[in-house]
């Protein structure tokens, strides 16, 4: 029998399985024996410990301990603190204004940039390749920083500089991974930047090559069963010009479909020198604006376009993430921290690869994130891998190791290979981003964010593939899977920049941060050419504190549209309806029409969501299908995506502005001159058009599905077809009975018991309002089972979490890591249509009309154990300190998992302390009565 390739070079430790033993275990064909899943032995650095004898005293002791991330602030003369990275901010508190946009800053200068005068940059694929242990070891090492010309390097100071761009590209382009990845953290090899780091710190350091915490507790769970079949490497780096490094890694190779010669997207940036390449694409928000300095913008590879990871269900993947940021924690233009932890939002990933806030790594190091890319329910549902809806999309000749009734390599037949797990848990649109403790907002704002598309038998990215399983969502058909011709990723986020054009952030205001300009894929008001046919738009709100409310309209010459344009413009506008097909990266049971045919939130108004999306909290993803050939749209037309959601502060949204008022410019922010300098007046400047679509002729055949065939029941029309059904239904008697036995927990997000330094807190199960401490454990569901053999069945551990707003007009988009939940109720009512049919990982609680202040969520815990997080995704709230730790424990676990504390000298562990209700919660079953 063939098996997945075991690691050929395990890190030296007695706990690692030998190659021969791994092969023997796999040949035995028992999933439960492929890997050792027992807790770490005593003596292992990550060994568990007994709960404190006096838990109250242990919890109280945490309040007086040093910050858990203190090791990140080391300076030549000792330790800094969280104020160190703020030292060079161009607007310290003494120079700040009372203006709202941007928060306590001044309007961002435009440098003559005109709206809709630059082409939108589409995402660039990372391009994973097969992880091959026979690839010769690379000769190039991760290049250390050196002095060089600004803005890509510092001309004088190595500790404030970056690696040479050509050297970094040569290293990233080198085939394979050296050293080869293993189950355990690589603590044998040294940090290749050690010499430069020691010169800066003026002392010796004990920094390993890999920043992952050592020991079995943070080793890759089920390493042999989910051995990575594909891999890639990238570096978080300061801004630099793209060299075309990843041109050959694009699936389309700039040769087919709309990305090929003659296609709409063959020219990546609309410039004469960007035909079929990203070489020369720089880091300006608009061609008229300055280049970003390497200390201002920190992106994946250090370049634009923004990056996209494309994965397939069933194929485990490894990302080697290098940290190429400055050694000096103050070399950051006054915001952002050089230590990072990467969270795949919201992957079904083991804790060691989830991006825990206090599992951060340092400049010069890498961290191997291994993402299994398996369907949730792997151990309990469809464990024989017999359901065609749970499958790996493939091309003829491809193979995949599957742990079914006859474990081994399976060959691609009829375009797919069946895999284990619950097909109802299929995900689609994700992203990954930094999660550094206390610095998530700053680091993500600064560029540490990429998008991630999951492909599956149901959502394979080939609209022509008709096997009765594939939903045939808009995509294209030139490739077997993963076509992006008519499938667009849109990262929308507000930003601000100073008078020199460099990105600016205010880290001093703990209420939240608002920029005064919205960028789409890091560009100021771009345009995009689209064909007259259907498209899928994957929309991510990547802001710090700003909610969005997006609308889509068509511009009409003359007065024939529903909405008048600005006075004297001779223009009017018509709504462009669409369907939502996925929410938070999860394809829904039904495609929800935003066309005025349904009262989507039962408020008596069908028009309030006609061509207008609901409020979109930070980190929420909405996938919509738009047809640019219907509703009167024709080639030559212009369409606009607008934001209608106004804010005054970062605490939460104000009101949505009427679409008519925005289009007529009755509502329009303007800059006025004041005694304190220029200031935005008469509204929020981001309430405006943000993206223009130019419709071009289409001569092909649109083979994509019609979302109208999948709508829920509505007046005059019966329920349509189902895309992906929910695993639980709120009105199903069997599900109601199951929910009644589920453990219940309550989390209240507010400011109770907060301090000036850490104002935002979370109360758990009626307890004290704590600020974040990674050593404190708030909740710990236990797995129902360990790894299972083919034929096993079950439901996993089911709990109900109530997420409650603490009041006072604030709003919080709460994110629970690891698993999606089904909203049972929102504010004591049934959820609106866009949540009724959805699985979610961000739960917006607030006073906005389509929000309400609490949700009860049914959520499962399966397959993996370890330490995870729950937090407000207004990341300025999270960083100050609206974040908590929860663990998934092994079956029957009695001891507590320890807490990693990283530093330049390695990672040490300390014991954890748990709340009194950490295992039992506060009851059983739903506790909110749902009204009509």
Locate the predicted segments by residue.
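Surface-exposed, non-catalytic interaction/assembly patches
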Residues: 460-480, 675-679, 699-736
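Histidine- and aromatic-rich segments of cupredoxin/plastocyanin-like copper-binding domains
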Residues: 346-378, 492-718, 831
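Charged, glycine/proline-rich intrinsically disordered loops and linkers
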Residues: 273-284, 376-420, 577-583, 587-604, ...
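Gram-negative bacterial Sec-dependent N-terminal signal peptides
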Residues: 2-30
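Active-site pocket scaffolds in enzymes
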Residues: 32-45, 52, 238, 246-247, ...
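Beta-strand cores of secreted/periplasmic/IMS beta-sandwich domains, seen most often
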Residues: 172, 176-243, 283, 299-350, ...
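N-terminal, post-signal-peptide metal-ligating segments of extracellular/periplasmic oxidoreductases
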Residues: 32-361, 366, 507-537, 597-603, ...
